[in-house]
Every structure is written in structure tokens, then in C-alpha cells.
């Protein structure tokens, strides 16, 4: 935990030791080398710089950051945005914008450019799919999601999918004079930031953190009348894995003229079938589908049964940032084994949930598989996802330091992964009295541990958690 705090507080000891990290938060070595090359070539030493892929994303970043940010197209479709290093607030705003909307250049594209400019001898050897990977991935996803292949768009990251979907819905509903947005439940950090930062002055954002009271949610939606634009939720929610009568919410949103956006990333489209309830599905494919956790990619799917299908499909397509070709090729290889791996994750997660639920060291446990509503959306019996969240009776820090699994902010990998979720996603909330009070109000424990259960032999997984729990109490 000392290293987690050190990362959040940017301690030189920790930052120097980190060779890599989640790509939207930690700049990959290949991207860093590419930045150094471009900065020297363009004579921009002493400037704060980021890379953005695609003209659509470029325009959005420039619109958001305003004056003071300049741009150079350093390679075809690749843009170097830069600002005064002394303007700390603008430099931070620029970095955060690229993080939120997921539009950066990632490692495979950076590697290709390093090779192009003779800065790297060759490509890292890896197995990829042959043939038309884009079509193959879209075909498989369409089968899982329940739509046509043409209704699925691949994006450069999961956040790019969320942002592109948001912009598409926003364009549709602004044209209809609808301005009221509603967030149901807790949203992932950057998803929430997109809603807060990119709505216009004439648009509003309200929150309903308790997704269990569907009657109250429907009455709230009714009050917006003809102004309801969209309702956004993760289903199941992250990190508490909450589910509800989503079909009732969907019916109400449609009755009131809104658009329902659902993100099923925490369980994946391989486990849950939510498109029948949504107008728009947005999801990360970095989780579950890329079981090695080594591909940045997302997907958007428009429900053919939505009354807004034609216009929404056009709006989303106009706003999306496509996935990079080599990322798709790698994903095309991994997606072939993903269903088998994901089924094993679900099976192991169910067994670990049963073990943790009766362990005296666990105070509270959250698991989608224990919900009475999951069966209505599960792809098949036992499709529960890999994620479990727990509150501990004992010392969280002792447990975290002792548990011998990989630690990091992602999930849905073939290897078990664990993180102190609120410390990594909302460090500002867990380190202030005001923040902790807010978390208590919405029912999230600051010391919550989120576990993504992998495909290792179950007995080995249980033994690791048993040892760490015994130490913590």
C-alpha cells in the first residue's frame, strides 16, 4: 500500500521504478521514445506534449482545452499537441482530456512509427490473427451482443467507446432539444468525468446512486418531461456489482423519450446480454475479450430495435475513433480463446465468492452472481463475470501487502488481479474527511478491495486468499 500511495502522490521513488502501467495513465516506453523524437525534430524542447490519434479526437481535445494548445501533424493522422510547460493548469487539463476520452497513441502504433523512423529495428514478436481481423472480431462480438456486424464499431479504447457513444447521443438529443442527463449508480472515474466535463452549459447532470429503488428512479425520470436526454449506467455496476430491474428502467426511459446507454464492461458481453434493454451499448474489450490484458480496444453497438436506431447509428459513427489495426489483429487472436477463459473465470469467481462469504475475515462481499436479477441478463447459467469486491474485518493494508497475486487497476484478465479500488480511482475521496463522508453516503467503503479472478487452478487461488486473510485479522 505504501507504493499505491506513492504512485498517487507521485513520489519519485515509485514513479522511477514503474517501467509501465495502464496505458491511459502511464506513458508506455515506446510512446515516450516517440515523443522524444518528435519533440527534438519539431524543435519543441521545454513544451508539455501529448500524442493524439485521429482528426476527430484532435478537434475535441482542442475544443476542450481552448487557447494555448498548439498542434503539429507529426505523421499521417498522428498529432502532437503541446503547450507551455509553465502553464501547469493547462498542461494538466490537456493530459486529463486525452486520458478521459481515450484518444492517445498506444504501444503498437508507437512501435510501428518507431520502426518507420528507424528508431527500432523490428516489431515485438507476437501471435496475431490472419486475414480480416476487423470483420472477424465484429462478427464474433455481434453474435455475443445480439445484433448485426454492421451495428458494431471498434474503438481505440474502452473510454473511446464511452466517449464516442456519449457524443453520438449528445448530438442526437441536442437536435431534439433534450438536455437532461442522468447517471444511475457509480460510474468508472473517466466515464463520470466525461459526463461532468463535456456536457454543455444548457445541459444538466443528475445522479441516482441507489439503483435498487427502481420505483424512485422511474419517478425521477418522469419529472424531466420532454427534456430527458439520456440515462447512463454500468450494468452490473463497478465496483459494487449491483444489478436491478433494468427492463423497467429501459421501458421508462423509452416512454419518456430518452436514450439508455449501458456499459457492461465489468462482466463483459461474453457474460451478460444487455443490448435488448439499451439503445446504445459501450464496452471495453481490453477486459475479458483481450484475456492477456495487452490490447487497448473498445466497442459500441446500436440496438436495431431502438426507435432512434438510424439517426443514432449515424451520430455514433461520425463521432467514433477507430481501433488501431495491429491492436485488432492481436485481439482477433485472443478473442478465439476468450469464451473458454471467461467461463473458467466465472467458475472460479463463483467458488471464491462462496469461500469468502463464509470467511470470518470478510465483513461484506459484493458479487453479481448473488443477485436475483442477474439471471435475466446472463448469457448462460453460470455467466457471472470475474469480479468480486470485499470489505474486510481486519486490516486492509496488511491483507493487500500479503496477498500474492498480481496487483493493478484492470480486470477480466486470465490471471488473478486485485486492487484497492477507491485508492486507485478516487484517491482524493479516500484521503479527505469530505470525501470519506461522501463515500459513506453512497455506500462505498474507502478500503474496498476489488478482485478479478483468473483462470489459475482454483485451489491455488483460494490458498493465496486464505493466507492473506489469516494475516489480516
State what each model feature region is.
Residues 1-160, 168-170, 184-200, 216:
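Conserved N-terminal alpha-helix of the aminotransferase class I/II PLP-enzyme fold
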Residues 88, 394-401, 458-463:
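Short, conserved charged micro-motifs
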Residues 311-312, 398-406, 464-469:
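Short amphipathic alpha-helices in soluble, non-transmembrane regions
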Residues 373-380, 422-446:
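Active-site-adjacent capping/gating segments
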Amino acid at each position: 500500500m505504501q507504493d499505491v500511495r506513492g504512485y498517487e502522490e507521485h513520489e519519485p521513488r515509485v514513479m522511477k521504478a514503474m517501467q509501465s502501467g495502464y496505458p491511459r495513465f502511464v506513458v508506455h516506453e515506446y510512446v515516450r521514445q516517440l515523443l522524444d523524437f518528435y519533440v527534438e525534430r519539431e524543435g519543441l524542447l521545454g513544451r508539455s506534449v501529448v500524442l493524439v490519434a485521429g482528426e476527430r479526437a484532435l478537434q475535441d481535445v482542442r475544443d476542450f482545452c481552448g487557447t494555448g494548445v498548439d498542434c503539429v501533424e507529426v505523421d499521417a493522422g498522428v498529432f502532437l499537441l503541446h503547450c507551455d510547460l509553465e502553464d501547469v493548469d493547462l498542461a494538466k487539463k490537456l493530459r486529463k482530456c486525452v486520458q478521459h476520452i481515450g484518444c492517445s497513441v498506444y504501444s503498437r502504433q508507437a512501435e510501428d512509427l518507431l520502426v518507420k523512423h528507424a528508431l527500432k529495428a523490428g516489431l515485438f514478436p507476437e501471435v496475431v490473427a490472419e486475414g480480416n481481423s476487423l470483420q472477424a472480431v465484429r462478427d464474433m462480438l455481434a453474435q455475443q451482443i445480439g445484433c448485426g456486424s454492421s451495428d458494431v464499431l471498434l474503438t481505440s479504447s474502452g473510454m473511446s467507446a464511452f466517449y464516442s457513444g456519449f457524443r453520438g447521443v449528445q448530438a442526437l438529443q441536442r437536435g431534439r432539444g433534450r438536455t437532461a442527463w442522468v447517471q444511475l449508480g457509480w460510474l468508472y472515474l473517466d466515464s463520470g468525468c466525461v459526463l461532468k466535463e463535456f456536457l454543455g452549459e444548457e445541459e444538466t447532470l443528475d445522479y441516482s446512486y441507489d439503483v435498487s429503488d427502481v420505483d424512485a428512479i422511474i419517478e425521477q425520470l418522469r419529472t424531466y418531461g420532454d427534456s430527458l436526454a439520456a440515462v447512463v449506467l454500468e450494468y452490473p455496476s463497478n465496483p459494487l456489482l449491483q444489478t436491478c430491474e433494468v427492463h423497467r428502467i429501459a421501458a421508462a426511459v423509452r416512454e419518456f423519450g430518452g436514450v439508455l446507454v449501458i456499459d457492461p464492461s465489468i462482466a463483459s458481453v461474453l457474460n451478460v446480454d444487455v443490448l435488448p434493454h439499451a439503445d446504445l451499448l459501450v464496452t471495453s474489450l481490453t477486459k475479458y475479450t483481450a484475456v492477456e490484458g495487452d490490447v487497448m480496444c473498445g466497442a459500441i453497438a446500436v440496438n436495431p430495435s431502438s426507435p432512434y436506431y438510424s439517426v443514432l447509428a449515424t451520430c455514433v459513427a461520425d463521432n467514433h475513433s477507430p481501433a488501431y489495426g495491429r491492436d485488432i489483429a492481436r485481439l482477433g487472436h485472443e478473442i478465439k480463446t476468450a469464451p473458454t477463459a471467461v467461463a473458467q473465470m466465472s467458475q472460479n469467481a463463483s467458488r471464491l465468492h462462496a469461500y469468502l462469504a463464509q470467511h470470518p475475515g470478510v465483513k461484506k462481499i459484493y458479487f453479481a452472481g448473488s443477485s436475483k436479477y442477474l439471471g435475466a441478463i446472463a448469457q448462460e447459467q453460470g455467466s457471472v463475470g470475474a469480479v468480486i469486491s470485499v470489505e474486510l474485518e481486519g486490516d486492509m493494508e496488511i491483507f493487500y501487502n500479503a496477498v500474492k497475486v498480481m496487483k493493478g487497476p484492470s480486470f477480466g484478465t486470465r490471471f488473478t488481479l486485485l486492487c484497492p479500488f477507491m485508492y486507485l480511482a478516487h484517491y482524493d475521496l479516500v484521503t479527505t474527511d469530505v470525501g470519506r463522508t461522501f463515500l459513506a453516503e453512497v455506500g462505498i467503503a474507502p478500503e474496498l478491495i476489488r478482485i478479478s479472478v483468473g483462470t489459475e487452478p482454483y485451489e491455488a487461488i483460494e490458498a493465496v486468499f486464505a493466507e492473506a486473510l489469516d494475516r489480516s485479522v
